[in-house]
């Protein structure tokens, strides 16, 4: 849709002839209907911009001010909301920690990753190792020296 400024419309006004069957009331009704639709659309999404700086103005927040009391001597004190009081040290009870006795079975992880099995050298629990016999090694060394 082409948009014109007011100056351009005033320049085009005398040159453009008005049609003889032009209905001004119907034209004004269409304009009013479009305005209503635009207002409804703006109201629909107005709650999203509640705290934004709309029209470059800061939002106004209501802050509760503390009450100021002045005594006979001229001293002013601020009365704020009462603080939540804690129990004294003697009244405090330490929370008791209960540890449940559980038995867990641990299986050796045979898979390094989920897609392929581990190498046989990596699995120590399944492969029995040969015990080293020191006496057998000493006997074999002595026999070689005697020859």
UniProtKB/Swiss-Prot annotation:
Keyword hit for Protein biosynthesis: yes
Record GO biological process: negative regulation of translation
GO MF annotation terms: eukaryotic initiation factor 4E binding; translation initiation factor activity
Main location (coarse class): cytoplasm
InterPro entries named in the record: Caf20
Function of the protein: Acts as an inhibitor of cap-dependent translation. Competes with eIF4G1 and EAP1 for binding to eIF4E and interferes with the formation of the eIF4F complex, inhibiting translation and stabilizing mRNA.
Protein name: Cap-associated protein CAF20
Source taxonomy: Eukaryota, Fungi, Dikarya, Ascomycota, Saccharomycotina
């Amino acid at each position: 849709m082409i948009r014109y400024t007011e100056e351009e419309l005033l320049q085009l006004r005398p040159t453009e002839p008005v049609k003889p069957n032009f209905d001004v009331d119907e034209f004004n009704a269409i304009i009013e209907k479009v305005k209503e639709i635009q207002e409804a659309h703006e109201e629909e999404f107005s709650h999203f911009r509640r705290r934004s700086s709309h029209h470059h103005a800061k939002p106004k927040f209501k802050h509760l001010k503390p009450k100021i009391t002045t005594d006979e001597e001229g001293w002013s004190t601020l009365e704020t909301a009462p603080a939540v009081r804690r129990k004294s040290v003697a009244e405090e009870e330490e929370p008791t920690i209960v540890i449940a006795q559980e038995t867990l079975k641990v299986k050796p992880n045979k898979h390094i990753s989920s897609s392929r099995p581990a190498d046989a050298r990596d699995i120590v629990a399944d492969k029995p190792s040969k015990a080293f016999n020191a006496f057998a090694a000493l006997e074999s060394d002595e026999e070689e020296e005697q020859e």
